[in-house]
Amino acid sequence: MLARLARLFSRPSTAPVWVEAAELRRWLAGEGAPVIVDVRGPDEFAGSLGHIAGARNIPLGELPAHANALAAEGRPLVMVCLTDKRSAQAAAVLVADGTRHVAVLRGGMKAWRATIG
C-alpha cells in the first residue's frame, strides 16, 4: 500500500489520489505520514463523527488562504469531509493551484468510522 502511494506521488499529478480508510490508517502509522486536512465546518469537525486524530480543521471556503502554507510543509496532504464530495473539491482546488501530493479519503468520515471505528 505505501509503495502504491509512493509510486502515485512520485510523478506529477493533474488529479488527486483516492485512498481508502484502511490505507490511510496504515499510512498514518508509518514514516512520512501525511497532513490530514478536514474541510468540514467547525461544528461538524467537533460533532458526533468526530475527526481523525491530528487532523487540521480548515473549512473548504478557507482553504485557498492556507494553500501555500500547506504546500510549503512538503508533506502529502489528505483531504477529508463527511463523505468525500467537499474533500474532492478541496483537492481539485489544491491540484489546480499546483500543489502536488494531494489525496482524498474515499467515503470521508463515514467510511473512516465504518472501517476504523
Task: Label the model's feature ranges.
Residues 1-34, 42-77, 85-117:
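Rhodanese-like catalytic fold shared by cysteine-dependent sulfurtransferases
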Residues 80:
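Short, surface-exposed ligand- or partner-binding patches at beta-edge/loop junctions that are enriched
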Residues 37:
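Conserved beta/loop motifs at nucleotide-recognition and modification sites
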